[in-house]
Amino acid sequence: MPVDLLAIAAHRDDVELTCAGTLLKAAAQGYRTGILDLTAGETGTRGSADLRAEEAARAAEILGVAERRNAGLPDAHLHNDEASRRVLVEEIRHFAPRVVILPFPVGRHPDHRIASELARDACFLAGLARYPAGGTPHRPHKILYALAYREDPVKPTFVVDISAEFERKMAAIRCYASQFDGARNAGEIFPTGQDLYSLIETQNAHYGSLIRTRYGEPFFTHETMAVDDVVALGVQSM
């Protein structure tokens, strides 16, 4: 059954770190949500692929996603090649999402950068009727980039208020004890002296402050956003 919102990321836990609150909010609004992890995280320094699979299953239950799948691509060896694109095209056709969340295409981790490019290309190719892959052709309507933990001077296109979802987001993140307990950095998150959980809260509080709420998750789109009612625009200017 198709999902309304699909989050794609390189590793189990990437989605939880960047957009778990948004997935929780969408599910509460009645939308079907899904997660596609591209790798099993088998080359990670901490934990193991099997343990991370168990942690991901527990996190998915908290997030209330309709389905979580793994593409089985090689961790630390992602490539935007024909074989990988075909795998992702079949996954996208399986989920048939309207909106897709991808990693931001700039970052220190090679897998994150390549996952973004690979998944975006696959979203286009999945709509080609004659592209040689399984499934019914489908092209997502919208691509969003999760912008959390960036140091680039990129202003979010919009920020989702996750104040009501923040505690459950943290509960999902804490499922990955093998990765985060005692850690001070992860993925795109550089160490600051805080423990990782405190640092995540600081980041989410920062983005929440930009829209005058307690916690938020930032997103970027290449397209200009349409507004139907300028009088109803949020975020106070004065």
PLM feature segments, named:
Residues 1-6, 81-238:
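Metal-dependent de-N-acetylase/amidase catalytic core
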Residues 1-95, 232-235:
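Active-site rim/loop-helix segments in enzyme catalytic domains that contact anionic ligands
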